[in-house]
Amino acid sequence: MFDLLALTLAGQVPAEQQGENANLHWRWLTEGLLEMTPKPGYRQAVVLSAGIHGNETAPIELLNQLVKDLLNGDRPLAVRLLVVLGNPAAMRAGKRYLHSDMNRMFGGRYRDFDHSGETARAQQLEQVIAEFFADEGAARFHYDLHTAIRDSRLPRFGILPFQTRPYSAEMLALLDAADLDALVIHSAPGGTFSHFTSEHAGAASCTLELGKARPFGVNDLQQFAAINRALQAAVSGEPLPLRSGSELRIFRVERSLIKRSEEFRLHLSDDTANFTELKQGTLLCDQPGEEYRVQHVSEWILFPNPGVALGLRAGMVLVEAPRSTLY
């Protein structure tokens, strides 16, 4: 049976583009895209994606091993499954992206960027998702796996897209079982892959940040054992593992820090970790005509990056929220 990651990195097409084993039918759609359907039927349709940023290799390796186990018959499949390796060209180059950040392009936002391989791929992925979920009566899920650029005080966390409906109890149970440290609830629509599948496909979706970006072959996948066990259980229809970590913390985005001037200043050191706590009154950022000081007793910073282009988000300010916010 073929190796999806090896084929994708080599830019090759499998000798056979569809097949089956005792448990499932599989179909290679195009580069980095594989669909699998269980023979006994299913109640869930699941998208598992990684590599939207090409240098975030650990989740790619994790998904590739899951695909191998399913194709080799070492693990049963109980859901209809679409596996997405998001940005093959950037994966081959070992870079986050080649031209522009694909995870800002979904929901048709690729039209706002100069044409590139990434805009074409984002458009292609939107079409593939639409076709995968078309006329699908089963419950829909999407887990988009990433690793972070910087260190994090809470190293494993999920980001839930903004939506007006309650978040899926089944999805939240999986995220709990995956031993995530925190969940962050977005307060506005965005261009992420998970927001697209939530808004346009009605899927229960989450972006998962699972450690730091490292080159292929040097990841310690044991660090990802909890999320791996949870995803394995989900695709195989097995009971979820019991949570072993401390209680999951819930945050919501209070404010996005938008860089409107080249004079924008973020008053944090370059090595400030995600989820660093900030005390009330602290001057966090300023630019001509605008400054932001911490408003609540405590706020937390996520994805600080003052080097972004004008008009883009240079960080997010979080406040802690009760779990009831999810329902």
From Swiss-Prot:
It is an enzyme of class 3 (hydrolase). Its cofactor is Zn(2+). Zn(2+) binds at residues 53, 56, 146. InterPro entries: AspA/AstE_fam, AstE_AspA_cat, Aste_AspA_hybrid_dom, SuccinylGlu_desuccinylase. It comes from the Bacteria. Binds 1 zinc ion per subunit. Pathway: Amino-acid degradation; L-arginine degradation via AST pathway; L-glutamate and succinate from L-arginine: step 5/5. The keyword Lipid biosynthesis does not apply. Transforms N(2)-succinylglutamate into succinate and glutamate. This is Succinylglutamate desuccinylase.
